[in-house]
Amino acid sequence: KLLMEVEDLEENREYCRHGLEHLLDVARISYIMILEDGADISKDIIYAASLFHDIGRGKSYQSGGNHDEASADIAKKLLPDCGYNDKEIIQICDAIKLHSGRLDIGEFQNKREENKELELADYLKISDQLSRNCFNCKVSNTCKWSEEEKNSNIQI
């Protein structure tokens, strides 16, 4: 219901949308990078954070406020029914709260290559960006993202 609400509210949105395809793209990209980096973050934690990270956008669109906080609040209420314990819920909700904003993609890749320890929120944030195909977007030239923030090619 919450996801359908976001999709309905974004039906005529010109820029990036936040539907199921986006949420799954973020989860898959995060999971691949975490596997590549050998980070100690479980698949179900990654997917939970990814699937909930934009779920509060409907509330944000309708009443204002920060979608990160709204998404974390929704996750906090629903995750216990999904079998997550308090520690996991805190980890997931903290990552959701910190996922907004954009990173310089090149700088992030340098951190990965230098084996710097990254948190779930770091992976969620960069995956949120990398899930966007800016290189194939018809409105990329009017997007508010800087060129360093845009996903300008297919990452391999």
List each language-model region with its residue ranges:
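Metal-dependent phosphohydrolase cores
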Residues: 1-156
